[in-house]
Amino acid sequence: MSTYTRPVMLLLCGLLLLTLAIAVLNTLVPLWLAQANLPTWQVGMVSSSYFTGNLVGTLFTGYLIKRIGFNRSYYLASLIFAAGCVGLGVMVGFWSWMSWRFIAGIGCAMIWVVVESALMCSGTSHNRGRLLAAYMMVYYMGTFLGQLLVSKVSGELLHVLPWVTGMILAGILPLLFTRIVNQQTQTRHSSSISAMLKLRQARLGVNGCIISGIVLGSLYGLMPLYLKHQGMANASIGFWMAVLVSAGILGQWPMGRLADKFGRLLVLRVQVFVVILGSIAMLTQAAMAPALFILGAAGFTLYPVAMAWACEKVEHHQLVAMNQALLLSYTVGSLLGPSFAAMLMQNYSDNLLFIMIASVSFIYLLMLLRNAGQTPNPVAHI
């Protein structure tokens, strides 16, 4: 049986369109707020409302999937995201935009939970790493192309919202031609997010998603600031960020393949060790191109491998709840990491960005090394 079945390919096509829209809005919303002369703290509050929506959406999507299935949950998530987009053009102002971005955040989180859960339920322990790698490749490719779109088209609010909303609605179309079966509805058993977070055998996967959130959130949010403080122009900053993201895209499939072939524990250990090496290399500033490349290739691939590790430790009917727990863990890490790193950079030195990344990665590496063996026969084998 092929890893990339027709439902999987159509799901990823829809995700690409939705990710393009997410990337465009995440880039332009802060700029629109600045053009409206809103103070910096209000811009930050609007961004925070989006991530708060992510947390809320993550919590209830599992119940929704169980009640109405993957397809309808996906349609509803896309419509909620589209509503959050249209609302930006209906009412302009701090409180209204904070509300609409909160709604958009809920829709985006629902999309991620639905897509990730559908992929994990469609796969097996032998190909789940490749499925999640394909998911991350599409996600980062959409993010990358979204940045290119921003640089090529008009950035005016009322020029952007119509075609972005159209792109979101177009993202629904691929799933109209297939049906993703939710096997969770065929069992009476149910699992909660809290139960998944407490599951001892999956703890390394949960911790890995937290670490991944810290690493990626810090790199995404603070790397441009770090490069700016090194005296680089905006064009140079864009180039180096492109190197970082491109490395993450190129690393997805090989890491997923290696994880399926040699085991997730071994690959996680190597990835975390490479993140530490890349962080140390960035401190020396001797060879930034290879340092950024290996940092991106290893750091951006932590999340799917950690997810695959955790998902092979649970029953098939627990996969949706486990995915919610992992996405929640990643979101918490992506909120805490940049906040703590920014405080260290402001009060002490910019180099503490990489020292912090290396430190949390080293702690996770110790956890991985303490795990003497990997389960030879994963529980979620179907």
From Swiss-Prot:
Its main location: membrane. It is found in: Cell inner membrane. One of its GO terms (cellular component) is plasma membrane. CDD domains: MFS_YcaD_like (cd17477). One of its GO terms (molecular function) is transmembrane transporter activity. Belongs to the major facilitator superfamily. YcaD (TC 2.A.1.26) family. The gene is ycaD. The chain crosses the membrane at residues 8-28, 45-65, 75-95, 102-122, 131-151, 157-177, 204-224, 231-251, 270-290, 291-311, 325-345, 349-369. This is Uncharacterized MFS-type transporter YcaD. InterPro entries: MFS (IPR011701), MFS_dom (IPR020846), MFS_trans_sf (IPR036259), MFS_YcaD (IPR023745), MFS_YcaD-like (IPR047200). Signal peptide: none annotated. It is a multi-pass membrane protein. Keywords: Cell inner membrane, Cell membrane, Membrane, Transmembrane, Transmembrane helix, Transport.
